Structures are given as structure tokens and as C-alpha cells.
């Protein structure tokens, strides 16, 4: 399963791990992706989303209905 937030689109980044001796090796910075079930009153059902913790804060701010409308407008099936 891909590590991409359905709300923000956050995905893994590539960077360096830097040692005390300043040696650099490649590493991945992974987003904090969570599976979360939300109750959608208008549809009378639960919706499960894979989203980052920032995505959860966006849902708290805008509401689940507005966020679902944006996701569906992108053509993603929920």
C-alpha cells in the first residue's frame, strides 16, 4: 500500500542521514500516515481514509464533507 496522504498528497521524501563525522548516506523521510474511519452523516456510513496527521487537522478545520468533495473532485474513489 502506498504511503500517500489522500488529503494533502504528502509522500515519502529522500534526504541524507548525517553522522557526527559528516558522512552522508541516503534515507527516506516517511509521512505519518494513519488509517482513520470517519462517520459521514450525509451518507449515513463510515469512510476509511489513509491520511497524515496534518490531513486529520485539515478535516477538523474544514469538516469531513468538504474534504471528501475535494478528494472526489480529483477522481479518487472512496
From Swiss-Prot:
GO CC list: cytosolic large ribosomal subunit
Positions of transmembrane segments: none
Gene Ontology annotations of biological process type: translation
Entry keyword set: Ribonucleoprotein, Ribosomal protein
Any Pfam family hit: Ribosomal_L28
Molecular-function annotations in GO: structural constituent of ribosome
Record-linked HAMAP family: Ribosomal_bL28 (MF_00373)
Similarity comment text for this entry: Belongs to the bacterial ribosomal protein bL28 family.
Protein's name according to its UniProt entry: Large ribosomal subunit protein bL28
Source organism: Legionella pneumophila subsp. pneumophila (strain Philadelphia 1 / ATCC 33152 / DSM 7513)
Gene designation per UniProt: rpmB
